[in-house]
From Swiss-Prot:
This is Protein E8^E2C. Residues 45-66 have a biased composition (Basic residues). The lineage of its organism: Viruses, Monodnaviria, Shotokuvirae, Cossaviricota, Papovaviricetes. Disulfide bonds: none annotated. GO terms for cellular component: host cell nucleus.
Length: 207
């Protein structure tokens, strides 16, 4: 009977632990639980990465405004200024003495209006040979056979006529056209012109 009573007292003296009891107050146990909670949060953040930031796009329809300098350049200056500023193109102006030194028309496309006008200002250089008809015909035959690369084209012999009739006036004439004044000078250096034939330098106003 005494043994049974002692056992009951021992059981009743031990503290009862229920599900609603407070957490453990041991510092070591609390540290382990804190580390476990941090690891769980870290794993959760790895499985759920942050979504990338969305860039805002500019609304359509907006254009970059032009500076006053660009507007002045487009309105005030010509095509030559735009060409030299944009592509580095240099336009070589010609002197009055170079007018009439080209035999071919410039191409229509691929160049500025100023460059085309400068090229059109160059007219083909010529020489006018004046003498007897037979002398000029023999000279034409000789230079076509020996100096064909030193001129562009050559005419037949011709005469001026009177303004009121068809009578011929003066000596016969023949024209020789060149690409440049350099070619004409080279022609005059190579070709031997008879003393009875006069040489007159000139240029066409156009080709």
């Amino acid at each position: 009977m005494k043994l049974t009573i002692l056992t009951k007292r021992f059981r009743s003296s031990s503290p009862l632990r229920t599900s609603g009891s407070p957490t453990d107050t041991n510092p070591a146990t609390q540290g382990q639980s804190t580390q476990t909670a941090r690891k769980a949060e870290t794993k959760g953040s790895r499985h759920h990465p942050k979504s990338p930031a969305v860039r805002k796009r500019r609304p359509y329809g907006r254009r970059r405004s032009r500076s006053p300098r660009d507007t002045t350049l487009r309105r005030g200056e010509g095509e030559s200024a735009r060409a030299s500023a944009g592509s580095g193109e240099r336009v070589a102006f010609i002197s009055p003495g170079d007018v009439g030194t080209s035999t071919r028309s410039p191409p229509k496309g691929g160049q500025s209006r100023l460059r085309r006008l400068i090229q059109e200002a160059r007219d083909p250089p010529i020489i006018c040979l004046k003498g007897g008809p037979n002398q000029l015909k023999c000279l034409r035959y000789r230079i076509k056979a020996s100096n064909s690369s030193d001129f562009e084209s050559i005419s037949t012999t011709w005469h001026w006529v009177h303004n009121k009739c068809t009578d011929r006036v003066g000596h016969a004439r023949m024209l020789v056209r060149f690409i440049s004044t350099e070619q004409r000078d080279r022609f005059l250096d190579k070709v031997v012109v008879p003393k009875s034939v006069s040489v007159i330098l000139g240029a066409f106003d156009g080709s």
